[in-house]
């Protein structure tokens, strides 16, 4: 039986990082994102600089203002966060259809079928993090392990912008030294109850037998017993079947130079072709999307009689679509190429070079 390989990707202080990206003056500042009303609002995300003052998510804004009176308070822009999240989820699904989103900024990916002797899971995780940064200019942390529980635990161990692998050779040591409050799923109330029963670390939890944990914590006790041993049989539950594969890029400055834009379309066509090959799919529609300097999004699609998957075929159609869309007087800030109406293609063995 093939050993499972699960990645948990968690964006670093997601909402705050988006705000810093869109307003560079906020970089390095204590940024608190949340509700507009100071007296009723709640903190959605705090940058690491704000966390140094004790500010954290789900904290009332009134308390955040007391802890960090000179912080930079930004009203949440959920439409923007959803758009960026969509870009990130599209990247995940370009690697595997087994993606289980947990929120706008985190997901589990089962990449067992992609792992090869020359392509370890950690390398794939770094390629995903690279792609996220190229598309969104945001950093993500990743955890890699043989089950979901350990992958999630690992993703939080080397933040921000880090990668941690938990495997059979280090899992016991990591779990035994872990503060009980750092176990995924153990909140303040659970931590307090565990302290009442002298459970402060993973080692303390490990030393309790299963029947005692069930007596103390009910049905949840069995899960705690398993967590102390790094056991988790839960599968990654794919939320939907992928219908398209695409890639998009935001230019560092607004562009209306055809040569620059067409080079980028060629690059995106190649990336899209690579991802189609990785999942052994081809498609019968091609879409080009443009976002103008005024943040207006326009797109054009072409349906095909026969499915395609090569860089040349994708580029030739994308080139035509771009020429139909472009306005020489209007600079653009983003360009995207997507292939849809996917169907199974011929099998292609993967190597590390398919991901570079």
Swiss-Prot record:
Where are the membrane-spanning stretches?
none
Instruction: Identify the EC number(s).
Output: 2.7.7.7
Keywords for this entry? Cytoplasm, DNA damage, DNA repair, DNA replication, DNA-binding, DNA-directed DNA polymerase, Magnesium, Metal-binding, Mutator protein, Nucleotidyltransferase, Transferase
Predominant cellular place of this UniProt entry's protein: cytoplasm
* Location within or outside the cell: Cytoplasm
Which InterPro entries does the annotation name?
A: DNA/RNA_pol_sf, DNA_pol_Y-fam_lit_finger_sf, DNA_pol_Y-fam_little_finger, DNA_polymerase-Y, DNApol_IV, IMS_HHH_1, Rev_trsase/Diguanyl_cyclase, UmuC
Q: Which GO terms describe its biological process?
A: DNA-templated DNA replication; error-prone translesion synthesis; SOS response
Q: Where does Mg(2+) bind?
A: 10, 105
Task: Output the Gene Ontology terms for molecular function.
Answer: damaged DNA binding; DNA-directed DNA polymerase activity; magnesium ion binding
Q: Note whether Flavoprotein occurs among the keywords.
A: no
Q: How does it assemble?
A: Monomer.
Question: What's this protein's name?
Answer: DNA polymerase IV
* Annotated source species: Staphylococcus epidermidis (strain ATCC 35984 / DSM 28319 / BCRC 17069 / CCUG 31568 / BM 3577 / RP62A)
Gene that specifies this protein: dinB
């Amino acid at each position: 039986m093939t050993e499972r390989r699960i990645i948990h990707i968690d964006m670093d202080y997601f909402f705050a990082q988006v705000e810093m990206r869109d307003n560079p003056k906020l970089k390095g500042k204590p940024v608190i994102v949340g509700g507009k009303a100071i007296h009723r609002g709640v903190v959605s995300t705090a940058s690491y600089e704000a966390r140094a003052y004790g500010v954290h998510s789900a904290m009332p804004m009134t308390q955040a203002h007391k802890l960090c009176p000179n912080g930079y308070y930004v009203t949440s822009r959920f439409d923007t966060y959803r758009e960026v999240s969509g870009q990130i989820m599209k990247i995940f699904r370009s690697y595997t259809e087994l993606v289980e989103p947990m929120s706008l900024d985190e997901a589990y990916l089962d990449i067992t079928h992609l792992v090869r002797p020359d392509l370890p899971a950690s390398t794939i995780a770094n390629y995903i993090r690279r792609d996220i940064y190229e598309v969104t200019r945001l950093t993500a942390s990743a955890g890699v392990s043989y089950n979901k529980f350990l992958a999630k635990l690992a993703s939080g161990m080397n933040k921000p912008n880090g990668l941690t692998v938990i495997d059979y050779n280090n899992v016991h040591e990591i779990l035994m030294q872990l503060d009980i409050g750092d176990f995924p799923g153990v909140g303040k109330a659970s931590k307090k109850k565990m302290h009442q029963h002298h459970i402060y670390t993973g080692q303390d939890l490990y030393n309790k037998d299963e029947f005692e944990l069930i007596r103390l914590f009910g049905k949840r006790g069995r899960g705690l017993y398993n967590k102390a041993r790094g056991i988790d049989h839960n599968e990654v539950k794919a939320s939907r079947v992928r219908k398209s594969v695409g890639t998009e890029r935001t230019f560092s400055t607004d562009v209306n130079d055809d040569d620059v834009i067409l080079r980028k379309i060629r690059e995106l066509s190649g990336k899209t072709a690579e991802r189609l090959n990785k999942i052994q799919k081809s498609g019968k529609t091609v879409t080009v999307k443009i976002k103008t300097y005024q943040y207006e999004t326009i797109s054009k699609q072409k349906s095909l009689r026969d499915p395609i998957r090569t860089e040349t075929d994708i580029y030739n159609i994308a080139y035509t679509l771009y020429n139909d869309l472009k306005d020489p007087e209007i600079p653009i800030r983003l360009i995207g190429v997507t292939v849809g109406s996917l169907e199974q293609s011929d099998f292609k063995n993967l190597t590390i070079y398919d991901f570079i």
